[in-house]
């Protein structure tokens, strides 16, 4: 199935397909893959991160569906 993957800030250099940048990229993944499994597959499991699917916070055990947009951010702090 196909999803969109968007990596932000320093994580954008870790796209599994072609280059870096802020634009979401299409990505073929196995049916029923979870957020956590995909994060591990693309080598970000050890990174501290915040994940969103279709604009909502997503736990690692959430299964992805065709057309979902997975966005991964590094931790953000400010004041």
Segment roles from a protein language model:
Residues 1-78:
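Ubiquitin-like/PB1-type beta-grasp interaction modules and other compact soluble beta-rich domains
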